[in-house]
Amino acid sequence: MKIATYNVRVDTEYDQDWQWSFRKEAVCQLINFHDWSLCCIQEVRPNQVRDLKAYTTFTCLSAEREGDGQGEGLAILYNEQKIQAIDTGYFWLSETPQQPSIHPEAGCPRIALWGLFKETTQNTPFLVINVHLDHISAHARLAGMTVILEELHDKIAQYPTLLMGDFNAESGEEVHQL
């Protein structure tokens, strides 16, 4: 099984020559070229999700962090010929994970998107967790990881788990040790 994580950079008008409209073809070609079984995507807006669905060969799960269907979010792309989704969900990395919310020290709302999958040739389910942790506060990153461990405790205990994403942290930071 080949897996990847990819921060595709949010679509923003401030990027000028690096706007999504100029990058989307190359990003989708790259994703298709590597023929991953599964790829976790960060910093994706609804228009980018539409493009990923239209121009890649993958099935796409997605969730956005504002709770209004318009904001930045996460996606999990998977190849249905290799991987089957069994269950999926998402929650906020905050003190109220089941409703749109923000950690008090975070720069913006953050979410975790998860999926329970199995390979089409195997019968063993595995858990995939996609995150994009806070870019401002180390404490918010730790708190976010704690929420993930609490919300998915039973699944993590039961299934092999892949935690993927953009941690916004250096390799020696405490968030990598949880």
Feature annotation, model-predicted:
Residues 38-125:
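Structured beta-strand-rich core segments of catalytic domains in phosphoester-bond hydrolases
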Residues 12-16, 93-104, 131-141:
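Surface-exposed cleft-lining segments at the edges of enzyme active sites
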Residues 1-55, 65-72:
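N-terminal, active-site-proximal structural segment of metallo-dependent hydrolase catalytic domains
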Residues 9, 45, 132-134, 167-170:
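Catalytic metal-binding/acid-base residues of hydrolase active sites
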Residues 1, 37-38, 126, 160-162:
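Short, Asp-centered acidic motifs that coordinate Mg2+ and/or phosphate
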Residues 1-14, 86-91, 114, 124-134:
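Active-site-proximal beta-strand elements of phosphoester/diester hydrolases
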Residues 127, 137-178:
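Metal-dependent phosphoesterases centered on the DNase I-like endonuclease/exonuclease/phosphatase
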